[in-house]
Amino acid sequence: MVAYFAYGSNMDRMQMADRCPDSVVVGPATLPDHAFRIATGGYATVVPSPSDAVHGVLWHLPETDEASLDAYENLASDFYRKIECEVTDGDGVRRPAMLYVASDPTPGRPVPGYQEKVVAAAIEHGFPAPYVGQLSGWIPPR
């Protein structure tokens, strides 16, 4: 099993059940000294940012689900790359985890419907209201 830190649409339980059917949600976690961004491709990434933190969801993935997620996140195209990090779980315990970051973190606009899914998942997992507000700020005006 690998620990996976999701901070974008993979926080959504139904999406993960479809992509990684044997995944198990551990619970909310935070990635210190990073900030959430939408990259130029229209999807989430994180960037180093001292004193900030990214809220997300920690999952346990068996190797088969990790391979499926690698394919879904299109590592071969170099849009995302997989890195190792250390997150803090809901009990304050620091844990090693992997996550995907955009190879090009240049800021962009979310693809239609993407950020709304991220915000809904953040609310479902009980993230702090100020953080949900920050995520909502990435939703383009209609």
Question: Model-found features: residue ranges?
Answer:
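Glycine-aromatic micro-motifs
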Residues: 1-142
